[in-house]
């Protein structure tokens, strides 16, 4: 077996050989601890028949661990400068395909259809750049890809927010949006010291297991999420005040009061105390008016 890419010495050698410099604008932080990478792969529960989709492979540290476990790996890399590096570091692995494209602009569903077998066990596994964590995760979830789940290394604070429960200070619109599509579980906390360059914050590995169907049924998903966003626009305001100022307007205050009453929600409550079921009920009541 080839020597792991993710050691401080080998990472330094690869970067020096290719004259690579980190781009802050791309949020590039490379993992230099093989044990952490193996933990990520373990959380994904891949089998020799699984397929893996990676985002932001960097120099291939996580990619090689995935390639050793999965039948096939597809990795999206936005940075053209890393393509020749990956061609070299991943040369021993014939089951890896690297696509030089921004995953936010890519047709991931089409890539899956042309790369993997129909019905194959698929997982998204990635060490995501902090600055695009939420857009990437929401794109993947909203696309309703044929994957079992998503395992990502992200900023610990964001992972806490995604996995948060009602009534906690971390709970917000991101928690509800993610948990509408998947169950969320914090798997491993990761210190900032295992990255180069070292970021300012710690990370966490988050496991999202895709739901067969959402926990609630609503006529209009966009309307549900609009209500959720409005309800958290000002965390110190009541649900009624947030709805009036951020969604329905003062002229429709009576309708908001009626909808809350019909949904059995005290108008003096704050958004952070509402469950997704209560938000779904509220969205249906507001839509009637």
UniProtKB/Swiss-Prot annotation:
Keyword Signal annotated: no
Similarity remark: Belongs to the class I-like SAM-binding methyltransferase superfamily. rRNA adenine N(6)-methyltransferase family. RsmA subfamily.
Gene Ontology cellular component terms for the protein in this record: cytosol
Descriptive protein name: Ribosomal RNA small subunit methyltransferase A
Any Pfam family matching the protein: RrnaAD
Keywords: Cytoplasm, Methyltransferase, RNA-binding, rRNA processing, S-adenosyl-L-methionine, Transferase
HAMAP family: 16SrRNA_methyltr_A
EC number from the UniProt entry: 2.1.1.182
Positions that bind S-adenosyl-L-methionine: 29, 31, 56, 77, 102, 127
Cellular compartment(s): Cytoplasm
Keyword match rRNA processing: yes
InterPro entries linked: KsgA/Erm (IPR001737), rRNA_Ade_diMease-like_C (IPR023165), rRNA_Ade_Mease_Trfase_CS (IPR020596), rRNA_Ade_methylase_Trfase_N (IPR020598), rRNA_adenine_dimethylase (IPR011530), SAM-dependent_MTases_sf (IPR029063)
GO molecular function: 16S rRNA (adenine(1518)-N(6)/adenine(1519)-N(6))-dimethyltransferase activity; RNA binding
Reactions mediated catalytically: adenosine(1518)/adenosine(1519) in 16S rRNA + 4 S-adenosyl-L-methionine = N(6)-dimethyladenosine(1518)/N(6)-dimethyladenosine(1519) in 16S rRNA + 4 S-adenosyl-L-homocysteine + 4 H(+)
CDD domains assigned to the protein according to its UniProt record, in alphabetical order: AdoMet_MTases
Described purpose of this protein according to its UniProt entry: Specifically dimethylates two adjacent adenosines (A1518 and A1519) in the loop of a conserved hairpin near the 3'-end of 16S rRNA in the 30S particle. May play a critical role in biogenesis of 30S subunits.
Broadest EC class assigned to this enzyme: transferase
Gene3D superfamilies reported in the protein's UniProt record: Ribosomal RNA adenine dimethylase-like, domain 2, Vaccinia Virus protein VP39
